[in-house]
């Protein structure tokens, strides 16, 4: 693989305060600790300047070791990177937010994050990593959100993170946080792809100067088996997507990423494969025609690969209806 530098041609999106976030980043969900460090090293060499992390992924310490090595070697400077992480659902209590953030900073070897997100609008008992029964889940309420959000605002005041935001928030829940926020959310990271286009959410977010980040932009075919459903549609083999790829002379994955960026959404595909890392980065240079965008618009089927049903076990306060605020 020939390394190439993409820093000067990377697309950026402006945030409400004038700072800019790289339009394409490296997702690290499902990247095991044994391989994530090498993937991050290769990504930085290729010109990636945006990493999307989370405490629950269990690999932040290895990412931190890779970052430290890159800083020492002069591959990249901290101020050239955009690094996001996420607050897990067992640390929503106001007293738990700063310790959780400080643990992430320690693992990543950083003094600050560029962006810190509430990972899910779901609350777990403090001593539980991932719930195995419904009684380990607590209700997500306006009062609980307000306490969490005020602690995140304090983290910004302390300089521990530059921006705060949310993930997996519906339009209704975005309105909820906006109604109580001194510092409004900069980003809402949600599942976004041609089968789940979320146009209403995108329109609302744009109206509030909130940027959407698209996770699972390629359909997340490699997610854990427990998260997969029988006979689910495969984005990467969709005939419309592949027809456009043939016209453009690129891969189906590149069409999906170019589509996301062209809609004004950040996208964070995960890969540990050097060739795919490079292909994904090149997608930022692809421009789809109006006709191609119109064809993709017709593919929306409101299909979630990450349905959230793992929060809805018996005895849980969560249903798919109140999680996504859909009828």
UniProtKB/Swiss-Prot annotation:
Substrate binds at residue 119. Keywords: NADP, Oxidoreductase. InterPro entries: AKR (IPR020471), AKR3G (IPR044496), Aldo/ket_reductase_CS (IPR018170), NADP_OxRdtase_dom (IPR023210), NADP_OxRdtase_dom_sf (IPR036812). The record marks 86 as: Lowers pKa of active site Tyr. PROSITE patterns: ALDOKETO_REDUCTASE_1 (PS00798). Optimum temperature is 60 degrees Celsius for the reduction of methylglyoxal. It is an enzyme of class 1 (oxidoreductase). The keyword tRNA-binding does not apply. It catalyses: a secondary alcohol + NADP(+) = a ketone + NADPH + H(+). Pfam families: Aldo_ket_red. Curcumin non-competitively inhibits the enzyme with respect to furfural. To a lesser extent, enzyme activity is also inhibited by indomethacin, coumarate, coumarin, and alrestatin. GO terms for cellular component: cytosol. The active site is at residue 57. Belongs to the aldo/keto reductase family. Monomer. Aldo/keto reductase with broad substrate spectrum. Catalyzes the NADPH-dependent reduction of aldehyde- and ketone-groups of different classes of carbonyl compounds to the corresponding alcohols. Highest enzymatic efficiency is observed with 4-oxonon-2-enal (4-ONE) and 4-hydroxynon-2-enal (4-HNE), that are lipid peroxidation products, and 9,10-phenanthrenequinone (9,10-PQ), a photoproduct of phenanthrene that is one of the most prevalent polycyclic aromatic hydrocarbons in the environment. This is Aldo/keto reductase slr0942.
């Amino acid at each position: 693989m020939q390394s190439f530098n993409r820093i000067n041609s990377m697309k950026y999106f402006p945030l409400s305060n004038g700072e800019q976030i790289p339009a394409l980043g490296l997702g690290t969900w499902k990247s095991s600790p044994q391989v994530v460090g090498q993937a991050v090293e290769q990504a930085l060499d290729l010109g990636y300047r945006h990493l999307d992390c989370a405490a629950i992924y269990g690999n932040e310490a290895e990412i931190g070791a890779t970052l430290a090595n890159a800083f020492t070697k002069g591959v990249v400077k901290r101020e050239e990177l955009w690094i996001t992480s996420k607050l897990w659902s067992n640390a929503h209590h106001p007293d738990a937010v700063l310790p959780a953030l400080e643990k992430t900073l320690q693992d990543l070897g950083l003094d600050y994050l560029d962006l810190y997100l509430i990972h899910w609008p779901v609350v777990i008992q403090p001593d539980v990593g991932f719930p195995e029964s419904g009684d380990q889940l607590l209700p997500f309420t306006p009062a609980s959100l307000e306490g969490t959000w005020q602690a995140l605002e304090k983290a910004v005041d302390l300089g521990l993170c530059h921006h705060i935001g949310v993930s997996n928030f519906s339009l209704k829940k975005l309105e909820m946080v906006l109604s109580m926020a001194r510092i409004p959310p900069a980003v809402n990271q949600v599942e976004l792809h041609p089968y789940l286009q979320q146009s209403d959410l995108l329109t609302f977010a744009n109206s509030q100067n909130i940027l959407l980040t698209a996770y699972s932009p390629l359909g997340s075919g490699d997610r854990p088996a427990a998260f997969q459903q029988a006979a689910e549609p495969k984005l990467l083999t969709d005939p419309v997507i592949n027809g456009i790829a043939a016209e453009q002379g690129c891969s189906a994955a590149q069409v999906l990423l170019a589509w996301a960026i062209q809609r004004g959404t950040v996208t964070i595909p995960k890969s540990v494969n050097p060739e795919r890392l490079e292909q994904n980065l090149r997608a930022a240079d692809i421009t789809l025609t109006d006709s191609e965008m119109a064809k993709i618009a017709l593919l929306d089927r409101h299909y979630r690969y990450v349905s959230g049903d793992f929060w809805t076990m018996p005895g849980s306060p969560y249903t798919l209806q109140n999680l996504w605020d859909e009828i």
